[in-house]
Amino acid sequence: MSAQTLSSTESSGSTLTRVLNGYARLCAAIARLCMVLSVIGVICLVAAVSFQIFGRHILNNTPTWAESLSLLLVLYVTMLGAAVAVRDAGHIGFESLADLLPAAGQRRLQIVVHLLVLLFGALMAWYCGQLAESVHHYKIPNLGLSEGWKYAPATLSGGLIVLFSIEHIIALLRNQKVVPAWH
């Protein structure tokens, strides 16, 4: 093998490494952003529910929009948190089967699991997107927003689950671990 071919191979390897490391950094940044948005959503949720309680018990005039807003915020907080839980391995898992396998078998099983999670995320994004599109003409009572906004967080979460599952598969193939976004 000539020196030029070897140099070209090393260069493409380092370029691939940079791209994969950049992808991991991008996924970590997206996960942190999702968590920040979830925290802001929880704060807004607490404020909306508190205002609803204040209006009902102190002012004797319940703000009708507060409950609808609270339900919508719960969807966003939950779906963003679920996507980040996939990335940061915060979801429920059963390790007993994996523990019985040799190291190579454990890695293969983990890849299969992440492929299944990726498939689930893709289907969730696709079908929730279809639902959002089918109801976008209708309005959420008391908010005046399109009903499609109820399905947007699940669509977004499905897309993020796909991105984060790809990150896990790449990390497993490189014999690395995904570093949780908050560490």
Where are these regions (language model features)?
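Alpha-helical transmembrane segments and membrane-interface helix-loop junctions
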Residues: 1-183
